[in-house]
């Protein structure tokens, strides 16, 4: 018997208003044939590779933490092109256009030789080797050992006009049901945050807030035991509607498991035994040992983990000291540096050598020491890093049209304020009162709401600021990266009315005649 039934599927209606389409910068930014070369000084930093060193009172930082496993986030400040005194004023019309920078090429220079760094902990939480054990070793109240290892090898850089977005796992707030027991595992959640200069990268133990989630302070090495390791959230940045945080990136990671250990301590999640499923033994993971065996009363821990190794460090697989050219960015922002700034996030632990410095503590002449005594020498650790940044910038124009300004205003209204295009309301009264001695007791109190100053949106974040406002040059052929750019693009540099421009090099070779017999 056929019975009619109403359709159970949902009916999806289109939105009542059209969805705004985000345009690519190539659709409204006009590029010129004027290129600049920008370069930084040699950027150096020195510190302790594992932790900050304070004075005896702990009130003053004496030696900062400088590790090869840290993120280096450079904030490059570029000059405002709208304030340039261009020799050729026909390049743009300041009444109808605004100038912006576009990043066309970058080279991240790294100094210092290749080297492998070692990290570790003098009280590392490991019971023993679980790969090739020769006897059954049960855990005790304290099985910590002095262990060191080399971290995962990592080379990476991310270029954008906004800070790089990172991700890590952190402690989450539990549900308020009142059934939380003391010592139970807390819930965890994925957190997005800006990667700042000095934030630790993943060295093989994951992107985790170790300070909050490893309270024994013994499960990882000293350099991350009190830190939060972050990893760039490539999925979020690739799906960003504007693509300001990541124009493009390059990365190379490698590691392998070198040693296999087991943790000490009480197991939080016991191995399911035979009592589940009403004793049917369907989910039993092991057969109980004999009562005469040591493991009968003291079963070993099942918290297995490896120590990773970055393996070989070679100059054949280097991402640095070579140019990268930006033709098409992964997002809608094709290399336009809004607010005249560029963020370069770098991680490179292939130059991870830590210097060991030994000093005679009693001050005697080393040549007069007859018997070696290790207690008379004080050992220090230092790590150094060396960077140099070079850029190729292209001068671009943005027409001040209504549809373009609406697009930019929806993206970030502060850009229009930076261009001094903000909405200025008509004055209510043409005559205003101005007191001469406004701060004196004889006059009324000054305005409680003074005009707001320009606020840096990243003032609470820590970056390595690099000022390039006076480091630009039109003479591309005078610099290494500039010559590479001219050669790879098939361009030649010319001077027109005092302005350096580049044009295509066209070859005019004659036709080869056929040889007569």
Curated annotation (Swiss-Prot):
Q: Which GO terms describe its biological process?
A: endocytosis involved in viral entry into host cell; virion attachment to host cell
One example of the protein's molecular function in GO is: structural molecule activity
Q: Which InterPro entries match?
A: Capsid_L1_Papillomavir, Capsid_L1_sf_Papillomavir, dsDNA_vir_gr_I_capsid
- Kindly state the subunit structure of this protein: Self-assembles into homopentamers. The capsid has an icosahedral symmetry and consists of 72 capsomers, with each capsomer being a pentamer of L1. Interacts with the minor capsid protein L2; this interaction is necessary for viral genome encapsidation. Interacts with protein E2; this interaction enhances E2-dependent replication and transcription activation.
The family classification in the record reads: Belongs to the papillomaviridae L1 protein family.
Sum up the protein's function in the record's words: Forms an icosahedral capsid with a T=7 symmetry and a 50 nm diameter. The capsid is composed of 72 pentamers linked to each other by disulfide bonds and associated with L2 proteins. Binds to heparan sulfate proteoglycans on cell surface of basal layer keratinocytes to provide initial virion attachment. This binding mediates a conformational change in the virus capsid that facilitates efficient infection. The virion enters the host cell via endocytosis. During virus trafficking, L1 protein dissociates from the viral DNA and the genomic DNA is released to the host nucleus.
- UniProt-recorded name of the protein: Major capsid protein L1
Whose protein is this, by species?
Human papillomavirus 25
């Amino acid at each position: 018997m056929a019975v009619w039934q109403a359709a159970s599927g949902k009916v999806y209606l289109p939105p009542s208003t059209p969805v705004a389409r985000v345009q690519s910068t190539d659709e409204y930014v006009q590029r010129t044939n004027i290129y600049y070369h920008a370069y930084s000084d040699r950027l150096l930093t020195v510190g302790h590779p594992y932790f900050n060193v304070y004075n005896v009172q702990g009130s003053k930082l004496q030696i900062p933490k400088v590790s090869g496993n840290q993120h280096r986030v450079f904030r490059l400040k570029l000059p405002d092109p709208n304030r340039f005194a261009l020799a050729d004023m026909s390049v743009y019309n300041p009444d109808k256009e605004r100038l912006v920078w576009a990043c066309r090429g970058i080279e991240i220079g790294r100094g210092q030789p290749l080297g492998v760094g070692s990290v570790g902990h003098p009280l590392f939480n490991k019971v023993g080797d679980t790969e090739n054990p020769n006897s059954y070793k049960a855990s005790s109240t304290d099985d910590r050992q002095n262990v060191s290892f080399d971290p995962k090898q990592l080379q990476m850089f991310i270029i954008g006009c906004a800070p790089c977005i990172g991700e890590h796992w952190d402690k989450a707030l539990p549900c308020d049901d009142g059934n939380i027991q003391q010592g139970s595992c807390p819930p965890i959640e994925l957190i997005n945050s800006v990667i700042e200069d000095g934030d630790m990268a993943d060295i093989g133990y994951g992107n985790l807030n170790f300070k909050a989630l490893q309270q024994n302070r013994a499960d990882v090495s000293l350099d991350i035991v009190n830190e939060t390791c972050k990893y760039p959230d490539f999925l979020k940045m690739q799906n960003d509607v504007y693509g300001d945080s990541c124009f493009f990136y390059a990365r190379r990671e490698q590691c392998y498991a070198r040693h296999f250990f087991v943790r000490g301590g009480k197991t939080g999640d016991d191995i399911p035994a035979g009592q589940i499923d009403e004793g049917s033994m369907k989910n039993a993971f092991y057969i109980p040992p004999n009562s005469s065996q040591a493991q009968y009363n003291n079963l070993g821990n099942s918290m297995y983990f490896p120590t990773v190794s970055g393996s070989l460090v070679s100059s054949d697989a280097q991402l640095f000291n070579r140019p990268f050219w930006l033709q098409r960015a992964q997002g809608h922002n094709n290399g336009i540096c809004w607010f005249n700034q560029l963020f370069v996030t770098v991680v490179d632990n292939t130059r991870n050598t830590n210097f060991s410095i030994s000093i005679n503590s009693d001050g005697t002449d080393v040549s007069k020491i007859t018997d070696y005594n290790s207690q008379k020498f004080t050992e220090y650790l230092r790590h150094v890093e060396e960077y140099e940044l070079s850029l190729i910038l292209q001068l671009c124009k943005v027409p001040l049209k209504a549809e373009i300004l609406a697009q930019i205003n929806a993206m970030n209204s502060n850009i229009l304020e930076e261009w001094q295009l903000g909405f200025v309301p008509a004055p209510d009264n043409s005559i205003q009162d101005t007191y001469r001695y406004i701060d004196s007791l004889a006059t009324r109190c000054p305005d409680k709401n003074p005009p707001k100053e320009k606020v840096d949106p990243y003032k609470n974040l820590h970056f390595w600021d690099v000022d390039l406002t006076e480091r630009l040059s039109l003479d591309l052929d005078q610099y290494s990266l500039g010559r590479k750019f001219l050669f790879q693009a098939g361009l030649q540099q010319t001077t027109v009315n005092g302005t350096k421009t580049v044009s295509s090099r066209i070859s005019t070779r004659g036709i080869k005649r056929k040889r007569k017999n």
